[in-house]
């Protein structure tokens, strides 16, 4: 690899945790939150989703990215089976404490699944 960065995933997690406070902000009353975040001085709480995640916690987006990275690093690219991804997604979800933030349907599946195979069986395309 020409420009290897062993901390890239860490930086992605940090950026996701930082930017979460600005997700979906559109109203005038949210300008203060947006302004505070854009100063880049500290992690901020989301003004609407206060129950969702405390400031500085990464989101479901990063959790899934970590799971996908684990699969690619551990299994390479020649044997990528859906079951490997499902097992790893479920493992990361449980390792992260079952964090909220996924779409309601997928959150429900992750909460109910007992295994990667069970998760795949419950998914309805």
Which residues make up each language-model segment?
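Structured, active/binding-site neighborhoods that engage oxygen-rich ligands
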Residues: 1-125
